[in-house]
Curated annotation (Swiss-Prot):
Intrachain disulfide bonds: 88-331, 252-266, 290-297
Keywords: Carboxypeptidase, Disulfide bond, Glycoprotein, Hydrolase, Protease, Secreted, Signal
Gene name per UniProt: SCPL2
GO biological processes: proteolysis
Glycosylation sites noted in the Swiss-Prot or TrEMBL record: 109, 350, 382
Protein name in UniProt: Serine carboxypeptidase-like 2
Subcellular locations according to the entry: Secreted
Stated family: Belongs to the peptidase S10 family.
PANTHER family tied to this protein: SERINE CARBOXYPEPTIDASE-LIKE 1-RELATED, SERINE PROTEASE FAMILY S10 SERINE CARBOXYPEPTIDASE
Length: 441
């Protein structure tokens, strides 16, 4: 009887040890992915997925997709891509903005949605890491209960730690020129991350990261400047009348977001403004506003991606830890998070002083973070202009406008573009390739 009992205990212990071993395997794990469900044949590029553990106990497991440059990975730049939100998966960048695959827009019939190759991938000339951050975003997860909420400034530190550990495991990329890139909300996190890496290069970390600069699209930069630019933008785009705009300017005095409750006139006119614009798609004012994910609607691709990323065969191919998350969501809108950077302008200043290049671009039909606000904060930095406002061209057609400043900052608009480059990926790719190769736009 005793032998049976000890045998049973031994089996249980062995099973427990096996489970511990399996869970440990996924700490700082990396897998080469040669096939992806939904894509026909082997992938025409090199994809690696994995987790990097962050923190003393590595309780935070940040998930990434790494794609090698299709040109010369030994020497080409290495780009870290952060999607905004906070809480939006980096799959948004990979499948909609600048990756080598995208969703095939077939009507969903209950089978696995298909993937197809793109022509506009930034991986044609750069290696790219698409990172799910903060913890809880995409496939990133925590092995213990989180007591400290992620924050803008905290993420800059975590991302720096991620990079040090990632490069420690991929030392062949440690000397490649390195850039941080992202759009939307990451306009607050990217400049802080650049400063954190720069500081680390001087203070703590060997070998240093070969940081060269950063890229930002329609970036949230300063809450007050960006939000107050929406009404002038709406007026310039003929969404509100001259009379309403003049009344708003007169009664609100340029402050349209933190209006004093006693300023009833201003509040009344803002209500009128909202009536004029609440049926406009803020991310791209030219497109129809879709409230349901129907096949003729732009956001249908988001629904297809949700079906794809929640498929068991896809998760297996990506080597997702089965215990990590339940349902994958593209954007975790209620993610616990402390928005502690109200303006990233001081970081831009410090990064310029440190000599880093930057490309700031704006889709010029975005009402969410309008180009007017981006131009305003860049102008307030008072850098001298070395290449004044001019069109930049693709095949003898105007693709947007650009201006370059003495602090190595280039500003560009993408004509007809929206809040993210998923609306104009071909044009954005050409703009990026020229800039990253050191050519004028």
């Amino acid at each position: 009887m005793a032998n049976k009992y000890f045998s049973s205990v031994l089996k249980s212990l062995l099973l427990l040890l096996h489970l511990v071993f399996l869970s440990k395997q996924h700490v700082d794990s990396a897998s080469i992915v040669k096939f992806l469900p939904g894509f026909e044949g082997p992938l025409p590029f090199e994809l690696e997925t994995g987790y990097i553990g962050i923190g003393e106990e590595e309780e935070v497991q940040l998930f990434y997709y790494f794609i090698k440059s299709e040109r010369n990975p030994k020497e080409d730049p290495l780009i870290l891509w952060l999607t905004g939100g906070p809480g939006c998966s980096s799959i948004s960048g990979l499948l909609f903005e600048n990756g080598p695959l995208t969703m095939k827009l077939d009507v969903y019939n209950g089978t696995l949605p298909s993937l197809v190759s793109t022509t506009y991938s930034w991986t044609k000339t750069s290696s790219m890491i698409f990172l799910d951050q903060p913890v809880g975003t995409g496939f990133s997860y925590s092995r213990t209960q989180q007591f400290n909420k992620p924050s803008d400034s905290g993420e800059a530190k975590r991302i720096h730690e991620f990079l040090q550990k990632w490069l420690g495991k991929h030392q062949e990329f440690s000397s490649n020129p390195f850039y941080v890139a992202g759009d939307s909300y990451s306009g607050l996190v990217v400049p802080a991350t650049v400063q954190e890496i720069s500081k680390g290069n001087y203070e703590c970390c060997n070998p240093p990261i070969n940081l060269q600069g950063y890229v930002l699209g329609n970036p949230l930069t300063d809450y007050a400047i960006d939000s107050n630019s929406r009404i002038p933008f709406a007026h310039g785009m003929a969404l509100i009348s001259d009379e309403l705009y003049e009344s708003l300017k007169k009664t609100c005095k340029g402050e349209y977001t933190n209006v004093h409750p006693r300023n009833t006139q201003c509040l009344k006119f803002i209500e009128e403004f909202n009536k004029c614009t609440n049926r406009i798609l803020q991310q791209l004012i030219l497109d129809p506003l879709c409230e349901t994910e129907t096949p003729d609607c732009y956001i249908y691709r988001y629904l297809l991606t949700t079906y794809w990323a929640n498929d068991a065969t896809v998760r297996e191919a990506l080597q997702i830890n089965k215990e990590s998350i339940g349902e994958w969501v593209r954007c975790y809108r209620t993610i616990p998070y402390d928005n502690d950077i109200k303006s990233s302008m001081p970081y831009h200043v410090n990064n310029s002083i440190s000599g880093y290049r930057s490309l700031i671009y704006s889709g010029d039909h975005d009402l969410e973070v309008p180009y007017l606000g981006t131009q305003a904060w860049i102008r307030s930095l008072n850098y001298s202009i070395i290449d004044d406002w001019r069109p930049w061209m693709i095949k003898n057609q105007i693709a947007g406008y650009t201006r370059t400043y003495a602090n190595k900052m280039t500003f560009a608009t993408i004509k007809g573009g929206g809040h993210t480059i998923e609306f104009k990926p071909e044009e954005a790719s050409i703009m990026f390739q020229r800039w990253i190769n050191g050519q004028p736009l």
